[in-house]
Amino acid sequence: MEEHTQGSHVEAGIVEHPNAEDFGHARTLPTDTNWFKHAVFYEVLVRAFYDSNADGIGDLRGLTEKLDYIKWLGVDCLWLPPFYDSPLRDGGYDIRDFYKVLPEFGTVDDFVTLLDAAHRRGIRIITDLVMNHTSDQHEWFQESRHNPDGPYGDFYVWSDTSDRYPDARIIFVDTEESNWTFDPVRRQFYWHRFFSHQPDLNYDNPAVQEAMLDVLRFWLDLGIDGFRLDAVPYLFEREGTNCENLPETHAFLKRCRKAIDDEYPGRVLLAEANQWPADVVAYFGDPDTGGDECHMAFHFPLMPRIFMAVRRESRFPISEILAQTPPIPDTAQWGIFLRNHDELTLEMVTDEERDYMYAEYAKDPRMKANVGIRRRLAPLLENDRNQIELFTALLLSLPGSPVLYYGDEIGMGDIIWLGDRDSVRTPMQWTPDRNAGFSKATPGRLYLPPNQDAVYGYHSVNVEAQLDSSSSLLNWTRNMLAVRSRHDAFAVGTFRELGGSNPSVLAYIREVTRQQGDGGAKTDAVLCVNNLSRFPQPIELNLQQWAGYIPVEMTGYVEFPSIGQLPYLLTLPGHGFYWFQLREPDPEPGAQQ
């Protein structure tokens, strides 16, 4: 269908927005309020995945063409960073129009086509919604600065002085000297927690809250499965506070959740709150109600500690952060990840830990960005296949729903001489042909060059080559996702660390019990044992609770000796791991059922 409404426009000082009824709607999947707990997420940058029209930029139609690959891999949900209309001064997180798709990506109808095709394959799609701020080119901001007494005059946080909220930290210390910027048109300062071209919305204005709820409903009406709410801790400002995690923010999130539960059951809100776990759990809402704010939240502090634990060859960085993680409501789930489109953030570590991570993983100053490291997974791990597999096994087995980053399943590298975080946002490497099979455009027109490194370049690292090799990282990753999908324990099971005398080995049980139709119960118990050392390591585990059970290695279905009363001895190769299903012993022949 031809799109006849090209985004928002201003009429008589009022910004008019299109209606979802102006567009087609994607088919919906059966309502399942717990799907996100079982899902494997896959973050893909639209511009980086596949170019359908040879303009050098990936687009929505190109992503639609590659859905069969995503389905084959075993992904349950795509996470798309912002694809809205934007001047692209911050990778699309500076939104110019919430109701329009960036023209180089396509149209709203192209998105509906993508969503419908994904749902036909059983794949869900969530996208980022930047609630905290807009681009300074957004019509709301332009109306606000030109007409202070008009309907949008109070849509942003304005002040005659830059002295307000002095306790709020500056997030982008590399580029910003203040959270206030003077506007020569309105002759006032405006508030921004991020870049100065991203003014913060004023959520103390009820009209702003209603406007953002309307944005939610527009995309939900089209059929989208949920949103990652970007930068949610910063929605409100109060004197005498650091302007983060304020009660008013949680009150607004409860409004968003109620709209979802009442009008769009089965859709999901994921909080992006780069905070300590004790602070983040508040974004799940009231545990007595099962959670009444966000369904999911990222566990940011866990990720750097996985890297730290393996480099230190000690389980304690992981053990300690998990021990500090409070319980979450029954309806909630953590999202966990190794890498994404941003730098490997080191905000949630101590100064000493940050220095250690820089020394170990960012020896070249160009590898640093803001308070983090701008590298992909494979180069961070020196392209060591054993380490890559160990990290992936941890990602897939620790508590939470895992998020993969496009290209990590084939071991893509980065280009550190590209600016800002573009080093980890290069084109997907499909084939060894020109432009890595990403685009038919002339190479000079590509949005970023494909990686041509001797180790990580597309001539050697690409999907086509790895599809043909049964031992490739791609096929190994697909197999691990398939194994994980067969066991509810990974998705919703309890987590119990087993300790042990060897600090280089991290062992834990994931366990869930399901009621059966005959009134009985069935337990799915998985034992995960991870060697964080580069050297072979022995471990003795107290498994008396499982005496008589048989550990069955889950990738090769190999039975290990049954568990007895004595400590269970295992030896793991360097950076090796085991996943065991603990299987009940078969009944003795002739035993009564």
UniProtKB/Swiss-Prot annotation:
Ca(2+) binds at residues 132, 200, 234-235, 237. Optimum pH is between 6.0-6.2 for the amylase activity and 7.0 for the trehalose synthase activity. Keywords: Calcium, Carbohydrate metabolism, Glycogen biosynthesis, Glycogen metabolism, Glycosidase, Hydrolase, Isomerase, Metal-binding, Polysaccharide degradation. CDD domains: AmyAc_TreS. Disruption phenotype: Cells lacking this gene do not accumulate increased amounts of glycogen in the presence of trehalose and show only a small effect in alpha-glucan. Combined inactivation of treS with glgB or glgC completely blocks alpha-glucan production. One of its GO terms (molecular function) is maltose alpha-D-glucosyltransferase activity. It holds the Pfam family Alpha-amylase. It catalyses: D-maltose = alpha,alpha-trehalose; Endohydrolysis of (1->4)-alpha-D-glucosidic linkages in polysaccharides containing three or more (1->4)-alpha-linked D-glucose units. The amylase activity is stimulated by addition of Ca(2+), but this cation and other divalent cations inhibit the trehalose synthase activity. In addition, trehalose synthase activity, but not amylase activity, is strongly inhibited, and in a competitive manner, by validoxylamine. On the other hand, amylase, but not trehalose synthase activity, is inhibited by the known transition-state amylase inhibitor, acarbose, suggesting the possibility of two different active sites. The active site is at residues 230, 272. Its EC number is 3.2.1.1, 5.4.99.16. It comes from the Bacteria. Pathway: Glycan biosynthesis; glycogen biosynthesis. Substrate binds at residues 90, 133, 198, 228, 341-342. InterPro entries: Glyco_hydro_13_cat_dom (IPR006047), Glyco_hydro_b (IPR013780), Glycoside_hydrolase_SF (IPR017853), Malt_amylase-like_C (IPR032091), O16G_dom_2 (IPR045857), TreS/a-amylase_N (IPR012810). GO terms for biological process: glycogen biosynthetic process; glycogen metabolic process; maltose metabolic process; polysaccharide catabolic process; trehalose metabolic process. Homohexamer. Catalyzes the reversible interconversion of maltose and trehalose by transglucosylation. Maltose is the preferred substrate. To a lesser extent, also displays amylase activity, catalyzing the endohydrolysis of (1->4)-alpha-D-glucosidic linkages in glycogen and maltooligosaccharides such as maltoheptaose, to produce maltose which then can be converted to trehalose. TreS plays a key role in the utilization of trehalose for the production of glycogen and alpha-glucan via the TreS-Pep2 branch involved in the biosynthesis of maltose-1-phosphate (M1P). Maltose-1-phosphate (M1P), the building block required for alpha-glucan production, is generated by two alternative routes: the TreS-Pep2 branch and the GlgC-GlgM branch, however it seems that the GlgC-GlgM branch provides most of M1P for the GlgE pathway in M.smegmatis. Belongs to the glycosyl hydrolase 13 family. TreS subfamily. This is Trehalose synthase/amylase TreS. It comes from Mycolicibacterium smegmatis (strain ATCC 700084 / mc(2)155) (Mycobacterium smegmatis). The gene is treS.
